[in-house]
Amino acid sequence: TALFADIPDWCTVVITLPTGMEPDGRLSFIKQLKSAGKAVNFTAQTGTPLNNWIARRFEANGKRIDRDAVDRLVFLSGDLMNRLIPEIAKICGYVPGDRVTAQDVEKLAHHIPEADAFQMTEEIARRNYDGAAAKLAELFAEDAEPVEIMGVIGWQVRQLYAAKIAEKSGRGVPFLMEILGTSSEYRARKIAETAAKFSLPALTNGVRLCAECAMKPRENGAITDAEAIKEFLICFAMESRRA
């Protein structure tokens, strides 16, 4: 309390926390901090407000970005502004003209693991197994732990399964957006398009294979053998081809 009492009236102290971090309200310091100040939540922008902000950032750099390129950028690099700012600067620096296309974004933007996992399933749906293996290699190149990689892949397969169930029940993209918890029509549509290329048995088997891979022998609470994930890719590809 004495620490906060020493702050003069003309001074404002701002303490920021990383996205997704929630302060532990049981700690005495956090209790004192909240009593002395005010907690303000900054929610992440999504949908149209985020897309408009991206377009303005490109305009500030003398570029005009196509609408489908905006959707592709958010899909590949995520919707966090602090992650998008350096990506926008990089793309503007490399694109020679004043127009930025979806092809430019595909070539230059950093792919978050979720995007690589989705593209891996896209390649399996196309029966381009070399392409799927290449995408898995990109996931491994990110230096993430195997358990994290399998978590991302499993999440993606479950989304495809949900999209397939929605398709079978005659529900459209708005319903899919709701059950996936996304405000991006582009993302929901891409997932629906890819799910349509799989059979329901293939995706059912995919969910089962993900669970089996997650239950592989563990050491110190983490999957230590990346071979288990490679085995999953082979089995999922075979099941998808057979189903």
Go through each PLM region and give its residues.
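Conserved beta/loop motifs at nucleotide-recognition and modification sites
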Residues: 1-243
